[in-house]
Amino acid sequence: MIFVNSGAGLQTWAGFSAYSASKYALTALADALRAEERGTVRVTSLHPGRVATDMQVELSALQGRPYRAADYLDPAEVARAVRLAVELAPGASAESIRLS
């Protein structure tokens, strides 16, 4: 099971309290499921930093700054991290992957 979370599930910033709270809750859910299903289901929390998505385009506009895709993670990097977690050898696990 892969939870695509956010860097906000590991760290919080002023002005993003509700968003961070929801991401910390997702981290806790993944941790609880991992403990409950240990040995039967692998649970990975993926915490990408800022990814080049429409959300970042909108945030840039709201903050009055230009959007530059080069400043963000390529979505393909997130996909590669998911694939890495899925293709681990039996018995191996990646409890948390952080991309920045």
What kind of region is each of these model predictions?
Residues 11-17:
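Active-site loop immediately N-terminal to the catalytic Tyr-X3-Lys motif
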Residues 3, 44:
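Rossmann-fold scaffold of SDR-type NAD(P)-dependent oxidoreductases
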Residues 22:
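Active-site helix of classical SDR
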Residues 41, 50-59:
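Short beta-loop-alpha junction of Rossmann-like oxidoreductase domains
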Residues 6:
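Residue(s) in the substrate-gating loop at a strand-loop-helix junction
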Residues 57-67:
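Short glycine/proline- and charge-enriched loop/turn segments
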Residues 45-46, 66-100:
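C-terminal helical subdomain
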Residues 11, 32-41:
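Active-site-adjacent segment of SDR/Rossmann-fold oxidoreductases
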